[in-house]
Each structure stands twice: as structure tokens, then as C-alpha cells.
Curated annotation (Swiss-Prot):
Heterotrimer of A, B and C subunits. The keyword Transmembrane helix does not apply. The gene is gatA. GO terms for molecular function: ATP binding; glutaminyl-tRNA synthase (glutamine-hydrolyzing) activity. This is Glutamyl-tRNA(Gln) amidotransferase subunit A. Keywords: ATP-binding, Ligase, Nucleotide-binding, Protein biosynthesis. Allows the formation of correctly charged Gln-tRNA(Gln) through the transamidation of misacylated Glu-tRNA(Gln) in organisms which lack glutaminyl-tRNA synthetase. The reaction takes place in the presence of glutamine and ATP through an activated gamma-phospho-Glu-tRNA(Gln). HAMAP family: GatA (MF_00120). The active site is at 77 (charge relay system), 152 (charge relay system), 176 (acyl-ester intermediate). Its EC number is 6.3.5.7. It comes from Streptococcus gordonii (strain Challis / ATCC 35105 / BCRC 15272 / CH1 / DL1 / V288). NCBIfam families: gatA.
Length: 488
């Protein structure tokens, strides 16, 4: 028996009425994973024993009728710490690492009696846009196994798209939730920087990283964000901003809502079919009463260059801790301390991670700091100011999530710059610390196209309002990959 077609509210109703138990729901989810995993390779670890133990304990305690998430299974990206469960960041460096603590976001999941069924595959240390940089396996697109699933949270996206789980957590540093959500036709949100605690997230770019939810529908996405949001004294960058119920505006109409469409988001490098799909989505939002107008974000064209200086610089600092001494991989053929560092890091890190460490170390080095890192910080401020000007007049910004649909596995491995440019439309949102969502908006060449909606700081509720209005009047979110029961 499978329950992957039921919403969280429907599953909650079944659990409360005792028509199914938490153990039965968990067993059904694990069965879905066993049946579907081979086609997509979403998981690094399936935590069957731990999940069933938590479900059994919950059945003994009883499902809380007032807690929507009680007994609901989900998957978690493998750079989010889970006590006693492998947390590898998809790297040889951490191939056997079992944390002795839970990330704050995981504590919040457990606090709502949610059940983690496994840890999902990703690009190593979240560095990549295709999930091909994993030490363990290559995740495949849920719609076409010859295409990339996007990255770095490819496993979290495909686990939802393939019907293995209804919900998952990912992390987003430059588009790592939104781009794979777009490529796999699911909902993925990057919250405002500081909305969700980063404590227990294996750091990549500390001024950019955010944990966020993947889901089948907009409302379920908001329901999961409700669980993981809030201030955390263990994370000095987490915000004191009050956390609303993110479902509050879902169902409200969008008449009079002002939405900006930046001309830079529809320019050079954007696939013509993707452009057509997004313009059709904009027209649809207008038919629902929204006012869509063209604007300019003039400094967004510098986003990719700025991002790869800042993110790589932060990564080169953050990844210094992986030295073969405290924990993680240590090379065997060593004769002195220098060997420990050089050989362990050379063997433990993959090519893309080493590339970014070198890029970041160069950008921070004396003689180059002012020309690169300092200058990137100044341009980042200009990008923030561009967004601030637009949000003085507009409620939301829309555009494509990615410039293309999913591309062939292996096609960009030798051209890192081409892969970096795939984040052209998502990176500025991270640089400005803004919230952004990708929702299914149509298809091009039989592959999903994501619509990105960007909101002002801490205004995820308005994003969800518009996204839900679009979803309620279209059928794109209901379409499933043929391999997993969808229609041709």
C-alpha cells in the first residue's frame, strides 16, 4: 500500500482516526523508497531502523490531533546533522561521520514528531548544480534518467518528485533548493537569510546558506517552513523576527498584487521555450488580478562573478577544519604533519571542492583581497540596493528559476563556468538574503520549468499567497513523471 498521493492533511486525518498507524505509514514510505530509489538514486542513507523505532514510540505515545506533522515521514539533505545517522555532505572527507548532535532544524522536526527516513544525495559540500559531484553516487532526474536533477540538493528534489516522500529538507547557497525544484517539477523555497537556524548545517558559504523545504504542493511547503523557522541562540545569524503562520495568506486572491518582471531575467542566455513558459505564467497571474510590470535590476548581471568570489572565499575558510586530524578522512601513507594535511585534503576532497577552495584562497590572499573579495562585497551591496528599490513599489519579483530545463548528465562536467551560469537567476536572491520559491509552471521539451517568485525580507507569506493562487488554477503540480505513474 502506498500513501504518496495523499497530502499531509489527509495523512494526518488517517493517523488521528487510527485508520493507519505511524509505523504503517513509515513502512509504506520505506517500501516506496525501495521500489523507486533505483530509478533516481536520491538517498545516501536510508535510516530504516531509526525511523521505525521513532514511529513505534509515537504510536505508543499516541498521535497528537493538534500537531499536523505528527508521524509524517520526510527526507533530509546529507549536509544537515542527524545524531547517530551518517552525515557525509556527499564527501569522502566525511564518508563515515556520525554526528553526536542534531541540527536545530532536525530538533524542530523531532519536536513535532516527524520521522526522518533517510539522508539525501547532493553535490559534495553543496558545491555544484547537478548532483554529479557526490562521492557516493549520481542522482538522476525524476522525469528523465539521462538528465541531471539539478543541485546541490538533487536528492531532496528527486525524493519528492519520484513519490518516495511528500517532504524533504535541502539547503540553498546560490540556488541549491530552487534549481533542482525547477528541474524536477516540485515546490522548493529558500527562506529569508536568518529565518531558519544554520546550526548543524555543514557550512559552505556562511553569509549565503539557508535550509529550506521541498514539497509536492505550496501549502505543504508552508506547513514545513512553519516547523523549522525561528530564532536559535546557537546561531548568531538567526533572526529575532516573529514567525507567522506561513499558510495564513494561502487561499487569498491576488487582485491588485504588484509583481515585477526584471528585463535582465528574460535576456541573453535564457532558453526561448523557458522564456515562453514564464511569460505565459506572468499572463496567468495577470488573469488572476495581479499587475505585472517590467523593471530593471541592473547589477544582477554581476551576480555570478560576485557569488563565486564570496562563496568560494567563505568555503576556503569553512573547509579549513577538514584537516585529517579531528575527524573525517585521514590519508594512510603519511610521514609527517604536512603529509596529514596535504594528502588527507587532496584525497578527501573532490575536484570541484578543491577548485573552489583554491579560488577562495586566491581571492582572500594579500595583494588580491581588495581587487576581488572587497570589490565583490561592494557589488553585492549594489545588488541588494537594486532589490530594495524594486520592493519599494512591488510586492514580488518573478522570473524563471533556471535559464534552461535539465541538461544531459555529464554534459557540463568539463566546463565549470557553464554550470555556474545555470545559477544566474537564483544567485542574486542569496546575495541579497531574500526569500525565493520555485513552483512548477509548465514544460519545455517534456521537462519541467520552474517559475521563481522572490519576496521582500521575511515576507515568505506573500510568496506563498501568489504561488498558491497560481497552483490552484493550474495543473502542473499534479503531473508526475511517467516512470512513477504519470501520463504521457
Amino acid at each position: 500500500m502506498t500513501f504518496n498521493h495523499k497530502t499531509i492533511e489527509e495523512l494526518h486525518d488517517l493517523l488521528v482516526k487510527k485508520e493507519i498507524s505511524a509505523v504503517e505509514l513509515t513502512q509504506a514510505t520505506l517500501a516506496d523508497i525501495k521500489e523507486r530509489e533505483g530509478a533516481v538514486d536520491s538517498f545516501i542513507t536510508v535510516s530504516e531502523e531509526e525511523a521505525l523505532a521513532k514511529a513505534a514510540a509515537l504510536d505508543a505515545k499516541g498521535i497528537d490531533a493538534d500537531n499536523l506533522m505528527s508521524g509524517i515521514p520526510l527526507a533530509v539533505k546529507d549536509n544537515i546533522s542527524t545524531k547517530g545517522i551518517l552525515t557525509t555532505a556527499a564527501s569522502k572527507m566525511l564518508y563515515n561521520y556520525k554526528p553526536i548532535f542534531d541540527a536545530t532544524s532536525v530538533e524542530k522536526l523531532y519536536g513535532k514528531d516527524m520521522i526522518i527516513v533517510g539522508k539525501t544525495n547532493m553535490d559534495e559540500f553543496a558545491m555544484g548544480g547537478s548532483s554529479e559531484n557526490s562521492y557516493f553516487k549520481t542522482t538522476k532526474n525524476a522525469w528523465d534518467g539521462s538528465k541531471v536533477p539539478g543541485g546541490s540538493s538533487g536528492g531532496s528534489a528527486t525524493a519528492v518528485a519520484s513519490g518516495q516522500v511528500r517532504l524533504s529538507l535541502g539547503s540553498d547557497t546560490g540556488g541549491s533548493i530552487r534549481q533542482p525544484a525547477s528541474f524536477n517539477g516540485v515546490v522548493g523555497l529558500k527562506p529569508t537569510y536568518g529565518r531558519v537556524s544554520r546550526f548543524g548545517l555543514i557550512a559552505f558559504g556562511s553569509s549565503l546558506d539557508q535550509i529550506g523545504p521541498f514539497s509536492q504542493t505550496v501549502k505543504e511547503n508552508a506547513q514545513l517552513l512553519n516547523v523549522i523557522s525561528g530564532n536559535d541562540p546557537k546561531d548568531s545569524t538567526s533572526s529575532q523576527e516573529a514567525v507567522p503562520d506561513f499558510t495564513n495568506k494561502i487561499g487569498q486572491d491576488i487582485k491588485g498584487m504588484k509583481i515585477a518582471l526584471p528585463k535582465e531575467y528574460m535576456g541573453e542566455g535564457i532558453d526561448s521555450k523557458v522564456k515562453e513558459t514564464i511569460l505565459a505564467a506572468a499572463k496567468h497571474l495577470e488573469s488572476l488580478g495581479a499587475i505585472v510590470e517590467e523593471v530593471s535590476l541592473p547589477h544582477s548581471k554581476y551576480g555570478v562573478a560576485v557569488y563565486y568570489i564570496i562563496a568560494s572565499s567563505e568555503a576556503s575558510s569553512n573547509l579549513q577544519r577538514f584537516d585529517g586530524i579531528r575527524y573525517g578522512y585521514r590519508a594512510e601513507d603519511i610521514e609527517n604533519l604536512e603529509d596529514v594535511y596535504v594528502k588527507s585534503r587532496s584525497e578527501g576532497f573532490g575536484e570541484e571542492v578543491k577548485r573552489r577552495i583554491m579560488l577562495g584562497t586566491f581571492s582572500l590572499s594579500s595583494g588580491y583581497y581588495d581587487a576581488y573579495f572587497k570589490k565583490a562585497g561592494q557589488v553585492r551591496t549594489l545588488i541588494m540596493q537594486d532589490f530594495a528599490k524594486v520592493f519599494e513599489k512591488y510586492d514580488l519579483i518573478l522570473g524563471p528559476t533556471a535559464p534552461t530545463v535539465a541538461y544531459d548528465l555529464g554534459s557540463q562536467n568539463q566546463d565549470p563556468v557553464a554550470m555556474y551560469l545555470a545559477d544566474l537567476l537564483t544567485i542574486p536572491v542569496n546575495l541579497a538574503g531574500l526569500p525565493g520559491i520555485s513552483i512548477p509552471a509548465g514544460f519545455a521539451d517534456g521537462l519541467p520549468v520552474g517559475l521563481q517568485l522572490i519576496g521582500n525580507h521575511f515576507d515568505e507569506a506573500t510568496i506563498y499567497q501568489a504561488a498558491a493562487a497560481f497552483e490552484a488554477t493550474t495543473d502542473y503540480h499534479k503531473q508526475q513523471p511517467v516512470i512513477f505513474g504519470g501520463e504521457k
